[in-house]
Design a protein with these regions (language model features):
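Cofactor-binding active-site loop characterized by glycine-rich and histidine/acidic residues
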Residues: 20-23, 36-166, 189
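Conserved small/polar residues in nucleotide/adenosyl-binding loops
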Residues: 198-199
């Protein structure tokens, strides 16, 4: 990656982080740590990797993203605003009772959200379903799933991973956000995985 591209991505990630902080500040609640830890990932995916169209968010040929760690919705919202799916001003309505930017992503109400998530561990299964449909119907889209390190302790994550391998879902990309923290504390103290076998 050249320096100019890297500089552009850093600027995008910085604006996404600003959007996260602004939304959580106005909401007076949220999950800023986990949201901030995926800003670089989302900046790269949405501006350099994924084929998306903010003017046609339900385009059948678009790439899809499943934010399995749904509590980090502020990061997804800030990214979608950065890409033009809705105004950045709307980030100030995060978690407001009459707003559409709630604590977890809602695919029915927010343009650019491909899967409603919230319960940890379910995202890879949903992404596998999307990828299998794409493969079966010979569609040319890719599916990305962003998964938290804490939720990787869920059995369903491993079952879905075996499913993806069995069906050779080459159009699926799972990204593990290894920030070392989960709600119960440091991941290594809650359920110490062998990092070498995971990464």
């Amino acid at each position: 990656m050249d320096k100019e591209t890297l500089s552009t991505l850093e600027g995008t990630a910085k604006r996404i982080r600003r959007g996260i902080i602004e939304g959580v500040y106005h909401a007076k609640s949220g999950h800023p740590g986990g949201s901030l830890s995926i800003a670089d990932i989302l900046a790269y995916l949405y501006t350099k990797e994924m084929h998306i169209n903010p003017q046609n968010p339900k385009d059948d040929t678009r790439d899809r993203l499943v934010l399995s760690k749904g509590h980090t919705a502020p990061a997804l919202y800030a990214t979608l605003a950065e890409c033009g799916f809705f105004s950045p001003e709307e980030l100030k309505t995060l978690r407001k009772i009459d707003g559409r930017l709630q604590g977890h992503p809602d695919m029915k109400n927010i343009p650019g959200v491909d899967m409603t998530t919230g319960s940890l561990g379910l995202g890879i299964s949903a992404a596998c379903g999307m990828a299998l449909v794409g493969k079966t119907e010979q569609k040319d889209y890719r599916v990305y799933a962003v998964v938290g390190d804490g939720e990787s302790e869920e059995g369903q994550v491993w079952e879905a991973s075996m499913f993806a391998s069995h069906y050779k879902l080459s159009n699926l990309c799972v990204i593990l956000d290894w920030n070392g923290l989960q709600i119960d504390g440091p991941v290594e103290k809650v359920m110490n995985p062998d990092r070498k076998s995971v990464v």
